[in-house]
């Protein structure tokens, strides 16, 4: 019996010891977890948005709403005073959202880890970039090779929002599509502003008015936005695209797809990032013949055709303008790349000798600065979410990620 009592006592002592050891371990792990969490909180990224210096640019890369979301990720947000004024966001609105308003651009660039902008940096802004600092903006690397090389040499990282690959997973970061959507919508509004009649047909006591006829050339993101807006305003809408796979989508929106009496196997749009491929000379002639047939009938033409790495193709020629009715309008969304219309002058509105207005503005998104800033800042926020997956204040530049690799044009002193 004495031996049994001893064994029981020993067993109880071991159990008690193990229990206290487990409790002590639990307490220790909780303390270390809290310490890690506290340490993680102290490592915050500083994200700043300067005022755009490009003349006439009204957009801003951070809005009060996007700043709130970024702060939930553990980041600190900064803006230069007046950065959002032209888009309708006051300094007070930023301060109410917990954003630090900095008096000068120079002070902001020195303070932050990440600079978020809309336009490519100016020469002065590029010089302000520091080693280890990250720039996120539209950049157009083919047009800014010298700046790209300069920033890479400095050891800065550059993420070009215009280089985000057009794949399903990257749609939330696709700033080009966001801006093209706005441009397509605004093109129709701008056309209506210069067109002297109703879009929708009306029957009144004063007489019957036919609906406007609108032709949209190119059914990419901008083209589809223009088609949707035109249809919703009541116009009879036609659309043309060299990619036959978009016909069903166009027709589902209430527009009529313009088919050519010509057979040519076109490259699938998915293989060209959603853009049109170069057509054969025979296809082009058939295309132009169809446009000449439509020119006397349509009141408004909106052209959106672009080919990657090339000047915009000339699709609406001078003789087609001459065949249009006086008071008609052409809006050329490809004006920045030379234009689809013969008479287009970049950033200007011209009137032909027969009274056709040709609009070549390139700042349609900036003309809707509040909406454009809201969408663009959301694209930026999603990019930052992918760059900081651990929410620990550390940028994880995963070059095995298709989206991050595709958008990064300078990193670790390499282009």
Give, region by region, the residue ranges found by the protein language model.
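Glycine-rich phosphate/diphosphate-binding loop of Rossmann-like nucleotide-binding domains
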Residues: 50-86, 200-294
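Glycine/threonine-rich flexible loop motifs
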Residues: 56-61, 124-129, 137, 274, ...
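Glycine/serine-rich phosphate-binding loop and adjoining beta1-alpha1 elements at the start
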Residues: 34, 46, 52, 123-213
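An N-terminal-biased, well-structured beta-alpha scaffold segment characteristic
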Residues: 44-150, 154
């Amino acid at each position: 019996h004495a031996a049994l009592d001893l064994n029981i006592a020993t067993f109880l002592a071991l159990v008690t010891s193990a229990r206290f050891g487990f409790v002590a371990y639990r307490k220790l792990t909780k303390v270390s977890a809290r310490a890690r969490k506290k340490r993680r909180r102290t490592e915050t990224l500083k994200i700043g948005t300067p005022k755009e210096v490009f003349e006439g640019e009204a957009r801003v890369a951070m809005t009060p709403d996007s700043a709130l979301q970024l702060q939930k990720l553990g980041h600190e947000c900064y803006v230069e005073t007046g950065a959002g004024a032209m888009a309708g966001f006051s300094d007070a609105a930023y301060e109410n959202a917990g954003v630090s308003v900095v008096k000068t651009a120079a002070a902001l660039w020195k303070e932050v880890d990440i600079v978020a902008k809309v336009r490519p940096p100016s020469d002065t802004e590029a010089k302000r970039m520091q080693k280890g600092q990250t720039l996120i903006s539209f950049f157009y690397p083919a047009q800014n090779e010298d700046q790209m090389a300069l920033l890479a040499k400095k050891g800065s990282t550059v993420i070009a929002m215009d280089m985000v690959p057009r794949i399903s997973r990257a749609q939330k970061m696709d700033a080009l599509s966001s801006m093209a959507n706005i441009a397509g919508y605004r093109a129709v509004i701008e056309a209506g502003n210069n067109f002297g009649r109703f879009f929708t047909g009306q029957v009144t006591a004063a007489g019957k008015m036919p609906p406007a006829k609108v032709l949209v050339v190119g059914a990419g993101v901008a083209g589809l936005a223009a088609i949707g807006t035109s249809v919703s305003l009541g116009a009879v809408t036609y659309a043309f695209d060299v990619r036959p796979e978009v016909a069903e989508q166009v027709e589902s929106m209430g527009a009529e797809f313009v088919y050519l009496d010509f057979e040519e196997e076109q490259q699938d749009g998915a293989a060209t990032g959603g853009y049109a491929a170069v057509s054969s000379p025979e296809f082009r002639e058939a295309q132009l013949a169809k446009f000449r047939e439509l020119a006397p009938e349509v009141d408004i033409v909106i052209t959106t055709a672009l080919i990657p790495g090339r000047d915009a193709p000339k699709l609406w020629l001078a003789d087609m303008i001459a065949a249009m009715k006086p008071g008609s309008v052409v809006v050329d969304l490809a004006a920045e790349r030379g234009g689809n219309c013969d008479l287009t002058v970049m950033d200007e509105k011209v009137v032909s000798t027969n009274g056709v207005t040709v609009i070549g503005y390139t700042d349609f998104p900036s003309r809707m600065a509040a909406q454009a800033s809201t969408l663009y800042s959301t694209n930026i926020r999603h990019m930052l979410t992918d760059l900081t997956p651990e929410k620990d204040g550390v940028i994880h530049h995963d070059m095995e990620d298709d989206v991050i690799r595709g958008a990064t044009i300078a990193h670790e002193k390499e282009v």
